[in-house]
């Protein structure tokens, strides 16, 4: 939903500039960001995203991207510790108010399946909820019980796909290996997509950013070996791998 979230917020900002009405939460143009574009109305409303894409829905997972488990206006640069709860936010999805975390996820998945999708999928922050940098950073081996519980929630809801993206441990190969193997043990049907945030792999050297695009020499041979070694290591244990990105125009379709 990340691209759709961007489109929604872009339209709201345009409407604000033209003096047109927008939802209450979107009225302060200084606060809203792409993360704020996902909620019950945009997903399940009369013109919600869950109703789009016709017959291909039965073969596709519907991924709720960054924002589904935090309140509005949250930013990792300001308060990264609020990310990673895995609890469908009731301000964004008021129908789940009063439900347990696992029941919220089941409600979400059931709604998506009822709309013709193969199932629901979740964007996941690569960190434990409440964690922070420095003294509050928690090692991968000390997070196992937390992740067992979150995997159990998804198992209860029959959510079978996680996109594990940015977070305090996003560049930590050991963390990604721990989580991937734990999911395989606790809930084998759960696909872990290791979405590794990195510069384009074919021109990490001599890279420039201009007019909204990346430019570089385009040669994989010029990429530092240690960077490619890290990608190789993640690929060894990954069911699914995503890198940002492999060529000059940054997308999230690799």
Show where each model-derived region lies:
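Active-site mouth loops of central-metabolism enzymes
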Residues: 3-21, 26-37, 132-147
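Catalytic domains of carbohydrate-active enzymes, especially glycoside hydrolases
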Residues: 1, 16-69, 153-159
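Aromatic- and carboxylate-enriched substrate-binding clefts and catalytic-loop regions
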Residues: 53, 58-254
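Intrinsically disordered, low-complexity coil segments
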Residues: 11-31, 47-50, 76-79, 92-102, ...
């Amino acid at each position: 939903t990340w691209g759709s979230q961007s489109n929604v917020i872009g339209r709201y900002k345009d409407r604000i500039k033209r003096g047109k009405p927008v939802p209450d939460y979107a009225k302060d143009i200084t606060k809203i960001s792409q993360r704020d574009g996902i909620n019950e109305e945009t997903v399940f409303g009369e013109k919600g995203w869950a109703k789009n894409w016709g017959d291909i829905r039965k073969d596709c997972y519907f991924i709720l991207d960054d924002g589904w488990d935090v309140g509005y206006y949250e930013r990792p640069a300001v308060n990264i510790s609020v990310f990673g709860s895995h609890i469908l936010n009731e301000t964004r999805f008021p129908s789940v108010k009063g439900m347990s975390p696992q029941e919220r996820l089941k409600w979400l998945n059931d709604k998506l399946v009822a709309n013709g999708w193969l199932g629901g999928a979740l964007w996941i922050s690569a960190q434990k909820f409440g964690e922070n940098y420095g003294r509050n950073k928690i090692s991968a081996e000390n997070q196992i019980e937390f992740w067992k519980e979150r995997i159990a929630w998804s198992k209860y809801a029959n959510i079978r796909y996680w996109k594990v993206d940015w977070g305090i441990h996003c560049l930590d190969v050991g963390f990604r290996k721990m989580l991937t193997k734990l999911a395989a043990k606790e809930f084998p049907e759960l696909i872990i997509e290791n979405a590794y945030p990195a510069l384009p792999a074919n021109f990490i050297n001599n890279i420039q950013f201009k007019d909204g695009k990346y430019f570089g020499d385009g040669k994989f041979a010029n990429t530092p070996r240690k960077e490619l070694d890290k990608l190789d290591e993640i690929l060894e244990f990954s069911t699914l791998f995503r890198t940002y990105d492999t060529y000059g125009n940054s997308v999230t379709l690799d």
